[in-house]
């Protein structure tokens, strides 16, 4: 991968020098890295949508970027020799060193909790899974937010690094590119090095945006992982290309800007929407005579063409905004079960799909949704504004000054800051209201960037209106003091992280194995052998289950262990459920714990439950498997041991062939006439997600004798949320019925109590040749009992 990244950077440098016409060598290098990386993501996505296999698509996209770079290298001499300014290099070196210290420390010191989705997504892309699905719900398509993972998978195709190491390389390289891009954006838009240094410093260390009573992010250096390196590489590259377009409207500049801007939608739709709207607004502003006088000939045409190209790329790329527009334009489309709505079940599914609903106006209006508890925070309230950095407070004055100076780049960044707060305060995003923290950080970052650009303009104005050196130096000192005060939070965070590193050196993880063990402590050589077997023998669209952490149903542990197994085996997992949310506030994960079927299977080893789960492989940790379940596995038809590790911890892989399982018995519908549930016993006094056997008393009236094997199962309805639980929380098995007229029979059923305390209704069903027949129901409640609370034993058989 490292060689591929270097070649990508060289190609990007050539394209910026020869096609965009950038002469400053460091500028061409940093913008080239960001543009080439972004171009690879966009091209790879478009090629895959033409149904080209993943590995072939990765080589084609990479080859196209290298080819464009080679063309640029051949044309570079036409714009003259490359220019290297020693002072710029020194300032960039100092800023890059500080950023590197924080970025690498944060990458090494601990795992990113958001990697629960990114690790397996990258792995599935490498397996060739496209279009992509949610790794935790293989039957659910995933909309949006995948560009970063797609690009990383494309580069990892060239080998030489694992997923975690690749993420570290990606974060460091792209953040360094953004250092250079922020610097040169400030220098070009703000008129000199004062703006360049101020903008870069504030963007990385002085944003200070968020909720003061929850979490405030100091800047890009603190959000070093997840999607952020790629998102802001796109963001600053687009702004720089916009600035270059204003200076010289070259076709290559307009095309590159349009491709990157349109592709941003599949990486981070929120940032695309805001940036695209701001650029469109400023393009309209150039039509105003007083503003348009400062625009070079041809800029309006080039800008319009670039924005039109961005819109087309957005529509065909499959990102969330493009999908919503296409769906809205398709008048023949009808609402489906996957369409987000106000029901609890659809709310749960929307989280797994990243499927966003948008309504206007938001109630209450002009409020932000707190990321922790979901409460409404008025946009202009002291509790919110008082928690933001100084850049947001200075934004109105900075915008007035930049408008007076006709600084179009500064106006764009200022509009991004304003829209990033107005949009989430005015529009309701349904399940994702709690995610408006992303908007808030973008607003704070854009405000910091705007103030940095404005500070350079102020300094240029002072320099042009006074000959006094002490006034100039006083202005520089004032700007430096303001930046330093805003960076204090970043350095406190750095010192705390450094204290953690020195106090707990075992948390400083560098190798790929150490990074995996940060999520899954027992991961070792036996796991590596088992995962390699699945990488070699697993196929696309096959699914996996594992019993990692079977003794600990904490959602975070189940999630982390599943993430590591999936990412190393490159197979999705069919073990989780769509959970109903009792409240709609804050940031909510779509993956919280095992489904009832998964818990019941690993407890009982029942082959009928396994059939309903439909995995293709079982990844078994024998030491956490009960003896009864281990024995049951060896007796299930269609389940065959395929691999056992020879080194390290014992790991066993089972192959599941559903076609080899015997047909499930069914009764005739007529034979169930007069059959009804008398009572369901054993539903009292248990805590959420606890397994037990319940007893169903079934009675029958009528002359027809009911006798034979049948599949009997239950479904649950959450009476508190007024919604059915997910199908994965329905459990059934095969039992033998033999009931005569007036008789009754007690059947035991595996049962897992629902995950939320509250009131429920259980309905009992029997499968027949003519469909499922409901034979009765019972209401019950689940209390939030503390772990270890004793509860009644199930009645004896």
Where are these regions (language model features)?
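Alpha-helical transmembrane segments at the extracellular/periplasmic loop-to-helix junctions
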Residues: 1-11, 64-65, 94-97, 226-237, ...
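Membrane-interface transmembrane helices that cradle and orient dolichyl/undecaprenyl
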Residues: 18, 234-253
């Amino acid at each position: 991968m490292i060689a591929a990244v270097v070649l990508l950077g060289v190609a990007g440098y050539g394209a910026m020098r020869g096609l965009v016409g950038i002469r400053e060598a460091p500028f061409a290098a940093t913008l080239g890295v960001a543009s080439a990386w972004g171009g690879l993501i966009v091209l790879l996505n478009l090629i895959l949508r033409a149904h080209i296999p993943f590995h072939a698509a990765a080589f084609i996209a990479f080859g196209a970027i290298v080819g464009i770079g080679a063309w640029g290298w051949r044309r570079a001499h036409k714009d003259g020799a490359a220019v290297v300014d020693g002072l710029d290099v020194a300032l960039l070196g100092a800023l890059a060193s500080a950023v590197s210290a924080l970025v690498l420390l944060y990458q090494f010191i601990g795992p990113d909790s958001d990697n629960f989705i990114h690790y397996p997504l990258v792995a599935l892309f490498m397996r060739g899974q496209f279009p992509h699905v949610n790794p935790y719900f293989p039957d659910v398509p995933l909309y949006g937010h995948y560009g970063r993972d797609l690009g990383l998978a494309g580069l990892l195709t060239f080998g030489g690094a694992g997923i975690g190491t690749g993420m570290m390389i990606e974060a460091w390289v792209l953040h360094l590119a953004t250092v250079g891009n922020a610097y040169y954006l400030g220098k070009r838009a703000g008129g000199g090095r004062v703006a360049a240094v101020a903008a870069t410093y504030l963007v990385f260390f002085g944003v200070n945006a968020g909720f003061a009573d929850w979490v405030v992010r100091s800047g890009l250096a603190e959000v070093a992982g997840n999607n952020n390196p790629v998102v802001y590489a796109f963001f600053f590259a687009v702004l720089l290309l916009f600035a270059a377009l204003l200076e010289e409207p070259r076709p290559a500049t307009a095309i590159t800007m349009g491709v990157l801007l349109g592709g941003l939608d599949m990486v981070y739709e929120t940032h695309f929407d805001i940036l695209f709207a701001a650029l469109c607004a400023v393009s309209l502003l150039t039509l105003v005579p007083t503003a348009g006088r400062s625009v070079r000939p041809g800029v309006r045409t080039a800008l319009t063409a670039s924005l039109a190209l961005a819109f087309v790329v957005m529509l065909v790329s499959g990102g969330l905004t493009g999908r919503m527009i296409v769906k809205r334009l398709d008048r023949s489309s009808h609402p489906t079960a996957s369409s987000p709505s106000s029901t609890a079940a659809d709310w749960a599914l929307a989280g797994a799909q990243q499927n966003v609903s948008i309504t206007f106006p938001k109630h209450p209006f002009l409020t932000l949704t707190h990321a922790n508890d979901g409460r409404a925070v008025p946009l202009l309230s002291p509790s919110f504004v008082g928690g933001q950095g100084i850049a947001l407070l200075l934004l109105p004055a900075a915008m007035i000054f930049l408008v007076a100076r006709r600084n179009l780049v500064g106006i764009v960044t200022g509009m991004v800051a304003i829209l990033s707060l107005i949009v989430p305060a005015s529009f309701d995003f349904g399940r994702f209201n709690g995610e408006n923290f992303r908007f808030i950080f973008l607003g704070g970052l854009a405000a910091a960037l705007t103030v940095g650009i404005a500070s350079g303009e102020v300094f240029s104005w002072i320099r042009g209106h006074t000959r006094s050196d002490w006034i100039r130096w006083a202005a520089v000192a004032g700007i430096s003091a303001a930046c330093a005060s805003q960076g204090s939070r970043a350095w406190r965070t750095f010192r705390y992280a450094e204290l953690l590193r020195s106090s707990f050196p075992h948390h400083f993880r560098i190798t790929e194995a150490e990074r995996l063990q940060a999520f899954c402590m027992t991961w070792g050589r036996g796991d590596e052998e088992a995962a390699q077997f699945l990488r070699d023998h697993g196929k696309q669209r096959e699914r996996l289950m594992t019993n990692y952490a079977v003794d600990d149903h904490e959602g975070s542990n189940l999630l982390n262990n599943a993430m590591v197994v999936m990412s190393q085996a490159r197979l999705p997992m069919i073990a989780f459920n769509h959970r109903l949310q009792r409240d709609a506030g804050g940031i909510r994960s779509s993956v919280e714990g095992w489904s009832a079927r998964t818990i019941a299977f690993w407890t009982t080893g029942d082959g009928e439950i396994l059939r309903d789960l439909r995995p293709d492989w079982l990844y078994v940790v024998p030491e956490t498997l009960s003896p009864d379940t281990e024995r049951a596995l060896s007796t299930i038809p269609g389940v065959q041991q395929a691999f056992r590790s020879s080194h390290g911890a014992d790991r066993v892989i089972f192959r599941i062939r559903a076609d080899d399982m015997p047909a499930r018995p069914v009764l005739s519908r007529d034979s169930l006439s007069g059959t009804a549930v008398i009572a369901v016993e054993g539903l009292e006094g248990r805590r959420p997600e606890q397994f037990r056997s319940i007893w169903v008393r079934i009675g029958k009236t009528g002359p027809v004798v009911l006798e034979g094997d049948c599949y009997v199962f239950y479904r649950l309805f959450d009476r508190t949320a007024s919604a059915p639980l997910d199908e994965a929380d329905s459990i059934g098995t095969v039992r033998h019925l033999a009931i005569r007229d007036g008789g009754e029979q007690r059947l035991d059923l595996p049962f897992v109590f629902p995950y939320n305390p509250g009131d429920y209704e259980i309905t009992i069903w029997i499968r027949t040749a003519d469909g499922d027949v409901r034979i009765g129901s019972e209401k019950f409640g689940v209390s939030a009992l503390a772990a270890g609370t004793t509860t009644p034993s199930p009645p004896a058989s």
